[in-house]
Swiss-Prot record:
One of its GO terms (biological process) is glycogen catabolic process. Residues 528-545 have a biased composition (Acidic residues). Keywords: Allosteric enzyme, Amyloplast, Carbohydrate metabolism, Chloroplast, Glycosyltransferase, Plastid, Pyridoxal phosphate, Transferase, Transit peptide. Its cofactor is pyridoxal 5'-phosphate. Its main location: plastid. Residues 522-550 are annotated as: Disordered. This is Alpha-1,4 glucan phosphorylase L isozyme, chloroplastic/amyloplastic. The lineage of its organism: Eukaryota, Viridiplantae, Streptophyta, Embryophyta, Tracheophyta. It comes from Ipomoea batatas (Sweet potato).
């Protein structure tokens, strides 16, 4: 039974609408099933600070509110009839899901509003997490699990003729994210709510997400993912919460001396709220998503009535498309503008909302100097960077603060999480484009840049001008810009001149010359000068000099993040070291106090407690408590049972039951049958060259090649049966990644139909991999591959999820792999490959032609070129592994270098898997060692070290 507060849902932002202390509303009686007997719902105004009840949903008791299966069934039946989203004739699964979700939402709203009211009353400091992605997954099972109502909802649905698991399967994954960035954000929200921290998330409400992935004979195909087609029962549109967002226009200085941004294109950002419940707590926080439209007065009614319908709707179409797609293609100028509009919409609407809340809570007298004491803004990567100039703009232009005041407030409020060391992912925007789209923000960025220049000059002085110039070139926010005139004179070198008296006689080659000219410290006669000029003229005729290209002026968003915030954190120890020593080394030398590490984590609720109930029950049984779900350090207690035969038997049984489920899932999704007795070897993540799915599939090809050269008896003696599972999306415009996906499916099509190989080796590509697929695959995994080129993966989170579920990792010393290996034990992690500090030297050796490829690597490439996997020769794909340098050449990601150690490490995997006692022991120790990688630990660190917020527990 679950404890809920007794607070009635109501409007959350506009409190002025509550004028009457009592309202009486006639509603259907849900407890009577679908009978339409009327009765009165009593709602007392929250402004009286009196408790309220929803009598038809819950029963009030002294210790809290309890929901049982009967009242839940009545609630579901009520929504099936009175919250119509489907035809009334039948109560089929889609309708059952929608009604069940709305029933759960009723329960969430009770706590949601109570949380909001309590935050308003206490006016404590609150954290705001801004992210372009939130990869939530399905909400139903997670919500009822956090409410501790899983059993009650299962029983209620059984009464109504349905199974909870089947009903939950009808929920589409929310298409609000793509990869680790969005999944981390969602894990953080779960931990924030569970740990009772006052916080909100802010994002965009994408209509079509990134894309829905289909796998055809031609490889990956992208189609729109209309996850909102049947509506979203979890969201509540806040029609009274909208903010204007402006693009283009111009900046003028008014008679009052203030800057005014006028003209241009105006849209409205409208709030959609999604409740995020904590586990075993009443705290329910908000994820506020922005959708975009134009104000109704901007609709061109005249053009519409004149028959120019497209023109009349143009403004609305331009506004709506901002929230159509996550990461729209940006090869075109239009695509770049759309992406920048997305980022600015997120920043502007969110900050306006945060400021409105701060002003409302402050009352009549707003003390802006207290803003950083009430607000912490965390930028999840560089996408929300425009928070910095936008906050300054609002404070100066709209609130009347000085530059000094606005800059001080902004720096104390904003913090930045870096998620990548890849140069292409450290965002840069065209200065020309930004100046056109956001003219006021460019002015502010220029002021920040000039302020930074002055600070650098002040810090390092002018004794070493070469060093100073390099610092400025590397650290400035504005790239490829001239140095401001205020300090340009520091770098002006005096010209060397010599005075020659034309009447003075000079002896040159034994001759006396009276007229001479000075040329580069050598005296040249007039005749020699004429001769040189003739030669220069001839050279000019022979050559058509090509002027050096002028590099484009850019705005470095990552540099702006570092300069404009008070904290910069990496997401794993090795990543944070690279950030300090390489990516932002100049900034680290200037402001070492800004830089921190916050190793990522994942929520143990979704990623083991709910997705792997069989293993969770075993853990609880052997530890003797379920407290590990909130305190994962207790997982370490499993270490003392790692060799216990009874535990090992139960552990293997749980793993096999999960594999049976996955085998059924793969058959349904791909058509391929796999054996649950095989090892499930899984690599699921975004398709990218640095993540090296190519290394994995080349290793599989080598394995297959060996098998084909052996007899059946030799094959079975050397290899353990494996099901190699891939999943992940390649960005639509990332050609090489799409080639890798195509190659994987081609290899699978050949191997999976080879009767000689049978169940000894299968290769499966799971189309449209998402959170729901992960919740099935991860509990069933035996081996998981995290094999990025060392030094290129910031952290990763899937490695943590796999380890938490007793999966053994094979990987490089990269990202969080380093810390996972430390915690689970070196002997329980399969390590291979070059280390991060070796990478630069290895690339240099390759460029110099010193790399000698392993014979086995060359054999694999030749095997592929023979057409074993179809008529495609894969020239472009294999070509990237050949040559010594050049775009798309030279094996930049060191697949060839690491290939020998990789396949040798895979042989060790086979050897370990043969002894199931050893393998199960390793599996148990991986779960035991995963305790550090809970997002609860990460959030505690953010709250203490960056946000300075405290948990707020309901009285």
């Amino acid at each position: 039974m679950s404890r809920l507060s007794g607070i009635t849902p109501r409007a959350r932002d506009d409190r002025s609408q509550f004028q009457n202390p009592r309202l009486e509303i006639a509603v259907p009686d849900r407890t009577a099933g679908l009978q339409r007997t009327k009765r009165t719902l009593l709602v007392k105004c929250v402004l009286d600070e009196t408790k309220q009840t929803i009598q038809h949903v819950v029963t009030e008791k002294n210790e809290g509110t309890l929901l049982d299966a009967a009242s839940i069934a009545s609630s579901i039946k009520y929504h099936a009839e009175f919250s119509p989203a489907f035809s009334p004739e039948r109560f089929e699964l889609p309708k059952a899901y929608f009604a069940t979700a709305q029933s759960v939402r009723d329960a969430l709203i009770v706590n949601w509003n109570a949380t909001y009211d309590y935050y308003e009353k206490l006016n404590m400091k609150q954290a705001y997490y801004l992210s372009m992605e939130f990869l939530q997954g399905r909400a139903l099972l997670n919500a009822i699990g956090n409410l501790e109502l899983t059993g009650e909802y299962a029983e209620a649905l059984n009464k109504l003729g349905h199974n909870l698991e089947n009903v939950a399967s009808k929920e589409p994954d929310a298409a609000l994210g793509n990869g680790g960035l969005g999944r981390l954000a969602s894990c953080f929200l779960d931990s924030l709510a569970t740990l009772n921290y006052p916080a909100w998330g802010y994002g965009l409400r994408y209509k079509y997400g990134l894309f829905k992935q289909r796998i055809t004979k031609d490889g990956q195909e992208e189609v729109a993912e209309d996850w909102l087609e049947l509506g979203n029962p979890w969201e509540i549109i806040r029609m009274d919460v909208s903010y204007p967002v402006k693009f283009f226009g111009k900046v003028i200085t008014g008679s009052d001396g203030k800057k005014h941004w006028i003209g241009g294109e105006d849209i409205l950002a409208v709030a959609y709220d999604v409740p995020i419940p904590g586990y075993k707590t009443r705290t329910t926080i908000s994820l506020r998503l922005w959708s975009t439209k134009v104000p109704s007065e901007d609709f061109d009614l005249y053009s519409f009535n004149a028959g120019e319908h497209t023109k009349a709707c143009e403004a609305q179409a331009n506004a709506e498309k901002i929230c159509y797609i996550l990461y729209p293609g940006d090869e075109s100028i239009e695509g770049k503008i759309l992406r920048l509009k997305q980022q600015y919409t997120l920043c502007s609407a969110s900050l306006q909302d945060i400021i409105a809340r701060f002003e409302r809570r402050s009352g009549e007298y707003v003390k802006w100097e207290e803003f950083p004491e009430k607000v912490a803004v965390q930028m999840n990567d560089t996408h929300p960077t425009l928070c910095i100039p936008e906050l300054i703009r609002i404070l100066i232009d709209l609130k009347g603060l000085s530059w000094k005041e606005a800059w001080n407030i902004t720096q104390r409020t904003v913090a930045y999480t870096n998620h990548t060391v890849l140069p292409e992912a450290l965002e840069k925007w065209s200065y020309e484009l930004m100046e056109k789209l956001l003219p006021r923000h460019i002015e502010i960025i220029e002021m920040i840049d000039e302020q930074l220049i002055n600070e650098i000059v002040s810090e390092y002085g002018t004794s070493d001008l070469d060093m100073l110039e390099k610092k400025l070139n590397d650290m400035r926010i504005l790239e490829n810009f001239d140095i401001p005139s205020s300090i340009a004179n520091l770098f002006t070198k005096p010209k060397e001149t010599s005075i020659v008296d034309p009447s003075e006689e000079v002896e040159v080659s034994g001759k006396v010359v009276t007229e001479s000219v000075e040329v580069s410290d050598k005296v040249v006669t007039e005749s020699e000068k004429d001769e040189l000029e003739e030669k220069d003229t001839e050279l000019e005729k022979d050559e058509d000099p090509v002027p050096a290209p002028i590099p484009p002026k850019m705005v470095r968003m990552a540099n702006l993040c570092v300069v404009g915030g008070h904290a910069v954190n990496g997401v794993a120890e090795i990543h944070s070291d690279i950030v300090k020593e390489d990516v932002f080394n100049d900034f680290y030398q200037l402001w070492p106090e800004k830089f921190q590490n916050k190793t990522n984590g994942v929520t143990p609720r979704r990623w083991i407690r709910f997705c792997n109930p069989a293993l969770s029950n075993i853990i609880t049984k052997w530890i003797g408590t379920e407290d590990w779900v909130l305190n994962t350090e207790k997982l370490a207690e499993l270490r003392k049972f790692a060799d216990n035969e009874d535990l090992q038997i139960e552990w293997r049984a749980a793993k096999r039951s999960n594999k049976v489920k996955v085998a059924s899932f793969l058959k349904e999704r791909t058509g391929y049958s796999v054996s649950p007795n095989a090892m499930f070897d899984i690599q699921v993540k975004r398709i990218h060259e640095y993540k090296r799915q190519l290394l994995n599939i080349l290793g599989i090809v080598y394995r297959y090649k060996q098998m084909k050269e052996m007899s059946a008896r030799e094959r079975e003696a050397k290899f353990v049966p494996r099901v190699c599972i891939f999943g992940g999306k390649a960005f639509a415009t990332y050609v090489q990644a799409k080639r890798i996906a195509k190659f994987i499916t081609d290899v699978g099509a050949t191997i999976n139909h080879d009767p000689e190989i049978g169940d000894l080796l299968k290769v499966i590509f799971v189309p449209d991999y998402n959170v729901s697929a992960a919740e099935l695959l991860i509990p069933a995994s035996g081996l998981s591959q995290h094999i990025s080129t060392a030094g290129m993966e910031a952290s990763g989170q899937s490695n943590m999820k796999f380890a938490m579920n007793g999966c053994i990792l094979i990987g490089t010393l990269d990202g969080a792999n380093v810390e996972i290996r430390q915690e689970v034990g070196e002997e329980n992690f399969f390590l291979f490959g070059a280390e991060a500090h070796e990478i630069a030297g290895l690339r240099k050796e390759r460029a110099e032609g010193k790399f000698v490829p392993d014979e086995r690597f060359e054999e694999v490439k030749e095997f592929i070129k023979r057409g074993v996997f179809g008529s495609n020769t894969y020239d472009e794909l294999l070509g990237s592994l050949e040559g010594n340098e050049g775009f798309g050449r030279g094996d930049y990601f060191l697949v060839g270098k690491d290939f020998p150690s990789y396949i040798e490490c895979q042989e060790k995997v086979d050897e370990a898997y043969r002894d199931q006692k050893i393998w199960t022991r390793m599996s148990i120790l991986n779960t035991a060692g995963s305790y550090k990688f809970s997002s609860d630990r990460t959030i505690h660190e953010y709250a203490k070290d960056i946000w300075n917020i405290q948990p707020v527990v309901f009285p």
